[in-house]
C-alpha cells in the first residue's frame, strides 16, 4: 500500500505529518493582510508554494504521496488569488479546500474526542476559529494572523486598545450555541504555545503541555504579560521566534471565544486537524 503524508495549508503556517509520525512546520503567513485586501498576496503565495515544494520533496524521500487540505486563508481569498494559488499548489500535490465545519470535524477526530459527545473542542488557527461538539460545529473567520492585522490597523498598540479592536471585530463573526459543556480540548499553535509558556518552558514538551490545564484567568494573565514584555523580548523567546507578533492578538481571539462560550479551562492537545486528515487519507485514499 502506498505510504501517505498529510499537509495542512494553514493561514499562519504549512505543516506536514509523514508516514512515520514525522512533523514539519514552515511559517508562511498565507493570510497576511487578507483582512484589508481580501486576497492572498503574491509574496505569501510565493512563500507557501516554496513550502509545499519542500514538503513534497520530503514526502517523496519517504516514499509517501502527499495530500493537502487548505483552510481559512484559501477558503476566503478573492480576486482570483484563490484560483491562482490552487492552480500552483495543485501542480505539486492534490489540495482539498475544507469548509469551516469540515475543518472542525477533522480537528475533533485528530484530538481523539470523536467518540466523546460530552466534550467540546476549540481550534484556533491563523485565519479562523472553530468550536465543535456533538451536534454543533461553528467556524468564525478570525484567527491570530487576521487579529494581528486588525490590531495593526485599528488599535494604538496598548493592551486595552488591542483587546477592544479584536473583540469588536469578533462580534457578529461568532455564533455561540446555548449549550453547557464542561470539558474542552484546545488545539492550534496559539493554545499549545500558551500552555508551554504557562509552565515556564523554553523548549516545547508535548507531554508537559498535554498534562496541564489552561484556565481562562491564566490565559488573560499571560496575554497581559506577553504584551508588557514587548515584541523585542517576545521575539527572543525560543517558543515565540515565529509567533512573537501574533501571540497576543491570537490570545485575545481565544479569550473572546472562551468568554462567549463560557469555557473556564482548556486541555491543550498537539493532535489536531492535521492528525484527523492523516487518518482520513489513510482510510480513504
Indicate where each model-derived feature is located:
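Two-metal-ion RNase H-like nuclease active-site motif
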Residues: 3-9, 119-122
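Helical "lid/coupling" subdomains associated with nucleotide-phosphate turnover
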Residues: 4, 18, 22-24, 33-57, ...
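A short catalytic or substrate-binding loop motif that flags glycine-/basic-rich loops and adjacent residues
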Residues: 8-11, 249
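Conserved Rossmann-like nucleotide-cofactor binding loop
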Residues: 12-14, 127
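Short, glycine-rich, amphipathic interfacial segments at transmembrane boundaries or analogous
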Residues: 27-29
